[in-house]
Swiss-Prot record:
Top-level division of the source organism's lineage: Eukaryota
SMART domains, per the entry: WNT1
Annotated GO CC locations: extracellular space
Main location: secreted
Cytoplasm in keyword set: no
S-S bonds: 89-104
Function statement: Ligand for members of the frizzled family of seven transmembrane receptors that functions in the canonical Wnt/beta-catenin signaling pathway. Plays an important role in embryonic development, including dorsal versus ventral patterning during limb development, skeleton development and urogenital tract development. Required for central nervous system (CNS) angiogenesis and blood-brain barrier regulation.
Family indicated by similarity: Belongs to the Wnt family.
GO molecular function: cytokine activity; frizzled binding
Disordered linker: annotated span: 33-61
Name the UniProt record assigns to this protein: Protein Wnt-7a
Amino acid sequence: SGSCTTKTCWTMLPKFRELGYILKEKYNEAVQVEPVRTHRNKRPVFLKIKKPLSYRKPMVTDLVYIEKSPNYCEEDPITGSVGTQGRMCNKTSSQNNSCDLMCCGRGYNTHQYSRVWQCNCKF
């Protein structure tokens, strides 16, 4: 008859922004665990939930962590992080140097500066 039927299947990843939202949600719901070793083994045998009363058992798709992330907004001499306090930020920016992002929601002081310099203009 000359007709041809073809079936093509494929899977697509979600849009990058949607994936970011999913990961952020999983990050916010991550459960702290601690490795449990037996006397003979140096490697951990399993991970135990650190606060078992307030959490359910994590699923394979959930995120878990062993140590809390450092707070990069505060100075931490142990990690060498200088924090963001006292650094200059851009009030109108939506990038990494924005005041809202750098100041971690603590608010910020604004200062207006004037600068005069010789421009060596020629007429």
